[in-house]
Amino acid sequence: MSLQWTAVATFLYAEVFVVLLLCIPFISPKRWQKIFKSRLVELLVSYGNTFFVVLIVILVLLVIDAVREIRKYDDVTEKVNLQNNPGAMEHFHMKLFRAQRNLYIAGFSLLLSFLLRRLVTLISQQATLLASNEAFKKQAESASEAAKKYMEENDQLKKGAAVDGGKLDVGNAEVKLEEENRSLKADLQKLKDELASTKQKLEKAENQVLAMRKQSEGLTKEYDRLLEEHAKLQAAVDGPMDKKEE
């Protein structure tokens, strides 16, 4: 394997490791959000867009080069005279195998680049929704406590007005308290609606993250299967060549 394909394969292994790390269930999105907001990660992200575009361009060029090599060595029977070159068939099969291997490596690297970027975005969105959900819940609890407090004060004022024998204008007090109660109830209902909307968004984000995790696990299994086929084909190619050299 040449130096450039060794670098691409190493990058692919690193991508698989990071995807598996992000899919670990016991690390919460909030903790990942703290990591993403750290100074080191923010420094990397500041140059990340340019690096990502350059990386995508390089991987696309490598995929195109691998496809070109596959088409070049695809039909060996029409390009090689097997009677005059008995060992050429094995040579062409080896070239074709390497081109296919390079296509798999570059293709999976390109796919995991988009998958990794999308997975990080979904985790950040999920952490933001969790924080918003907690904030709305606290606001709803605060509004509920305030409403209970005003209702208790309303009852106390009614009792005080009855004891004083009409010294207080009970009608005006009741009107004011009812208006305050209606206002508090409206605020409470608004907070409940916002909390329900946030919960729906959170469930949607969690479903998207779960789908991305399942997709990444499927890609990892497929890559492991291709590695096994790679090893088998490599052994099949190296065996006849070793015998030929002997």
Curated annotation (Swiss-Prot):
GO terms for cellular component: clathrin-coated vesicle; cytosol; endoplasmic reticulum; endoplasmic reticulum membrane; endoplasmic reticulum-Golgi intermediate compartment membrane; Golgi cisterna membrane; Golgi membrane; lipid droplet. Gene3D superfamilies: 1.20.5.110. It is linked to Deafness, dystonia, and cerebral hypomyelination: An X-linked recessive syndrome characterized by sensorineural deafness, intellectual disability, dysmorphic facial features, dystonia, pyramidal signs, almost no psychomotor development, and hypomyelination on brain imaging. GO terms for biological process: apoptotic process; endoplasmic reticulum to Golgi vesicle-mediated transport; intracellular protein transport; positive regulation of ERAD pathway; positive regulation of intrinsic apoptotic signaling pathway; positive regulation of retrograde protein transport, ER to cytosol; positive regulation of ubiquitin-dependent protein catabolic process; protein localization to endoplasmic reticulum exit site. The keyword Membrane applies. Pfam families: Bap31 (PF05529), Bap31_Bap29_C (PF18035). This is B-cell receptor-associated protein 31. GO terms for molecular function: MHC class I protein binding; protein-containing complex binding. Functions as a chaperone protein. Is one of the most abundant endoplasmic reticulum (ER) proteins. Plays a role in the export of secreted proteins in the ER, the recognition of abnormally folded protein and their targeting to the ER associated-degradation (ERAD). Also serves as a cargo receptor for the export of transmembrane proteins. Plays a role in the assembly of the mitochondrial membrane respiratory chain NADH dehydrogenase (Complex I) by stimulating the translocation of NDUFS4 and NDUFB11 from the cytosol to the mitochondria via interaction with TOMM40. Homodimer and heterodimer with BCAP29. Binds CASP8 (isoform 9) as a complex containing BCAP31, BCAP29, BCL2 and/or BCL2L1. Forms a complex (via C-terminus) with TOMM40 which mediates the translocation of components of the mitochondrial membrane respiratory chain NADH dehydrogenase (Complex I) from the cytosol to the mitochondria; within the complex BCAP31 interacts directly with unprocessed and processed NDUFS4 and NDUFB11. Interacts with VDAC1. Interacts with VAMP3, VAMP1 and membrane IgD immunoglobulins. Interacts with HACD2. (Microbial infection) Interacts (via C-terminus) with HRSV membrane protein SH; this interaction is direct. Residues 2-6, 65-102 are lumenal. A motif (Di-lysine motif) lies at residues 243-246. The chain crosses the membrane at residues 7-27, 44-64, 103-123. It is a multi-pass membrane protein. Residues 28-43, 124-246 are cytoplasmic. Residues 165-237 form a coiled coil. Belongs to the BCAP29/BCAP31 family.
